[in-house]
Amino acid sequence: MVSANREMAVYCFDTLVSHYNNEETPPPAFEEANHPLFVTWKKIVNGGEPRLRGCIGTLEARRLISGFKDYALTSALRDRRFPPIQAKELPSLQCTVSVLTDYEDAEDYLDWEVGKHGIIIEFTEPETNTKRSATYLPEVPAHEGWTKIEAIDSLVRKAGYNGVITEAVRRRINLTRYQSTLFSMHYSEYLSYVKATRGVVGPVINGINKHAFA
């Protein structure tokens, strides 16, 4: 089974740096495979709690190399919840790559474990018959400290449902659970990797070495 690894996170940073420089992305150092995947960018300022800056991926299997290249940029630049990440933010960024596996149909909306499973919900609004769906990666409910019901209710809101969330609404949910592996890398670790493996002090963006940025 393919697991998320350091080289995947490096490739996402390479892709973003290359975008800012309008140049070709260095070739990846991980093997090709087919899996669903996500790329998450967070920003860490003054040692504080990481703040989400973008998270987008696909629940359908696709080629990892093109997938990480596409979603590294999509999550950084086109997550509609946030303004696009700017080059000057690079030194504060943390990248997390996730590879999704082990999809299973759940018996009901409670048939999953916090901290172990990611969840996909699909349901039809009782008032309008509008179809809704949304997902949380495995680490989200655990990080938020949610119970299963709290996670489900939050995900129902994420899916766009604005009505009263009753037990009847919850029982309309078709839930798919999955597992994932993830790997997180801060920009400073990326610089160390580039220096150790390529003999380069650090990427240069628009002629400015990124060590110069605050």
UniProtKB/Swiss-Prot annotation:
Protein name, entry field: Uncharacterized protein At2g38710
Transmembrane segments: none
Pfam families per record: AMMECR1
Record PANTHER family: AMME SYNDROME CANDIDATE GENE 1 PROTEIN (PTHR13016:SF0), AMMECR1 HOMOLOG (PTHR13016)
Lineage, top ranks: Eukaryota, Viridiplantae, Streptophyta, Embryophyta, Tracheophyta
Cysteines engaged in disulfide bonds, as pairs: none
Protein source organism: Arabidopsis thaliana
Residue ranges constituting the AMMECR1 domain according to the UniProt record: 1-194
InterPro entries the record matches: AMMECR1, AMMECR1_dom_sf, AMMECR1_domain, AMMECR1_N
UniProt xrefs under Gene3D superfamilies: Hypothetical protein ph0010, domain 1
